């Protein structure tokens, strides 16, 4: 009998694991000559944990290259750097996954794109992205170590739920437009949400123009409602429908990405987005019992309006520098916005937050919760829940050390007094 050619596969999620039907895989207990159809439905990729549906046929040439790489790293500890290397491969040409993600001009993602997708970079020349990093680094932490020892308390309550640390994942979307179309959008959302939930905190997801605009909120619903969908500023009618769906799915909260009015992706896809006036915001808040968050607040005047309309939280963000070039960095505007809010509602803020030390600075500048974007996006691309959880743990450990060494026993003690910077030095 003529021997049937055996197929070779690569996991399309992690782009790392390879499987040869002829040889099988002792690690996952697959005997030689086990075909793809014969692999049990319960089988999971040993690298990223995804099911067999992600195994895709690959040529012998590509298989040999990937097999060598996989063999070399098969027994390597699966730490953050391991997943960073996977992300670097998946984002080839648009993100170098550098040790410091700062938007500097020499970075792969930076610079004018002249109509091409901005990938992981910023709008225009990327100056706002860069300024987010620079403005935060202008502040230094004041070390204070003579104090009775106490383990820092990092938990807090927000939207009537307790979370283990004052860190969340910022609202991210757009795998096809910005991330080399490397994995399905829903899989990306799931990694962000599940990684946050298993870390004792909350993930946010956005919506994007090239998949159904309710995919994010539905994925949150599938995650037992543990997550927050943030919608682009679409028509008022559509936003009311999406918020109604969020309420039916019993999500923690919902929000509108007001700075998304400048989204080039939605504009080029012929899907209009709009600026929203005060009456629009009131209508959205009054339409639901859900806590409503307004994102994209970058000035004191808008913060006052967010308070006036009855929002549940004020989210300070310039979309990671991806909508308006030449704008102020988050750390430059956060103190005055926090002063305007005056503790009446929670203040959320993102903007070049990479470590627990950055988190402490953002909290000291007036935020109740710091949000992380690009690093968590890369972790979700590289392996879903597992690396996302690893990154949260890394940030939490740094935050613990930062609080310990600045004399902060709890979050109430995190104030501008622990900073030295433009207005303190």
State where each predicted segment sits:
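Short metal-coordination and nucleic-acid-contact micro-motifs, chiefly zinc-binding Cys/His arrays
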Residues: 5-7, 41-42
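The −1 position to Zn-ligating cysteines in a subset of zinc-ribbon hairpins
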Residues: 10, 18, 44
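Short, cysteine/histidine-rich loop/knuckle motifs that typically chelate Zn2+
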Residues: 13, 46-47
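Short, non-ligating residues that shape and space the ligands of small metal-coordination modules
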Residues: 20-21, 54-57
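Short linker/helix segments within small regulatory modules
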Residues: 27-42
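An N-cap/entry alpha-helix motif that binds or orients negatively charged groups
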Residues: 65-163, 423-425
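N-terminal functional module of multi-domain proteins
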Residues: 117, 126-214
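Alpha/beta enzyme core
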Residues: 194, 222, 234-349, 356-374, ...
């Amino acid at each position: 009998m003529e021997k049937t050619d055996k197929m070779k596969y690569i996991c399309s999620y992690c782009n790392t694991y390879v499987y040869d039907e002829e040889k099988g895989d002792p690690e996952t207990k697959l005997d030689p000559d086990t075909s793809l159809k014969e692999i049990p439905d319960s089988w999971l990729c040993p690298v990223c944990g995804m099911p067999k549906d992600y195994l895709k046929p690959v040529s012998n040439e590509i298989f040999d290259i990937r097999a060598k790489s996989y063999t070399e790293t098969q027994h390597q500890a699966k730490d953050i750097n391991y997943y960073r290397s996977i992300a670097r491969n998946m984002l080839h040409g648009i993100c170098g996954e550098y040790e410091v993600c700062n938007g500097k001009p020499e970075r792969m993602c930076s610079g004018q794109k002249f109509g091409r997708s901005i990938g992981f970079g910023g709008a225009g020349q990327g100056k706002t992205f860069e300024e987010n990093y620079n403005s935060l680094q202008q502040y230094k932490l004041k070390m204070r170590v003579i104090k009775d020892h106490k383990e820092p308390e990092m938990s807090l309550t927000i939207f009537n739920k307790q979370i283990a640390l004052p860190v969340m994942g910022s609202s991210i979307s757009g795998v096809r437009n910005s991330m080399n179309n490397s994995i399905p959008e829903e899989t990306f959302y799931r990694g962000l949400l599940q990684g946050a939930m298993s870390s004792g905190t909350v993930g946010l997801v956005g919506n994007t123009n090239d998949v159904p605009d309710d995919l994010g909120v539905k994925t949150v619903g599938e995650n037992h409602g543990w997550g927050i969908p943030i919608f682009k500023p679409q028509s008022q009618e559509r936003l009311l429908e999406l918020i109604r769906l969020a309420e039916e799915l019993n999500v923690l909260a919902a929000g509108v990405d007001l700075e998304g009015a400048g989204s080039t992706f939605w504009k080029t896809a012929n899907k209009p987005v709009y600026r929203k006036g005060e009456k629009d915001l009131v209508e959205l808040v009054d339409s639901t019992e859900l806590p409503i968050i307004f994102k994209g607040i970058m000035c004191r005047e808008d913060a006052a309006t967010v308070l006036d309309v009855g929002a549940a939280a004020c989210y300070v963000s310039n979309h990671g520098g991806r909508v308006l070039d030449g704008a102020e960095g988050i750390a430059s505007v956060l103190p005055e916005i926090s002063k305007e809010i005056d503790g009446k509602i929670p203040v959320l803020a993102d903007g070049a937050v990479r470590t627990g030390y950055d988190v402490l600075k953002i909290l000291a500048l007036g935020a109740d919760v710091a949000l992380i974007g690009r690093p968590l996006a890369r972790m979700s691309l590289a392996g879903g829940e597992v690396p996302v959880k690893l990154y949260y743990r890394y940030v939490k450990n740094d935050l613990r050390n930062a609080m310990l060494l600045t004399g902060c026993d709890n979050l109430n003690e995190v104030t501008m007094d622990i900073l030295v910077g433009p207005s303190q030095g």
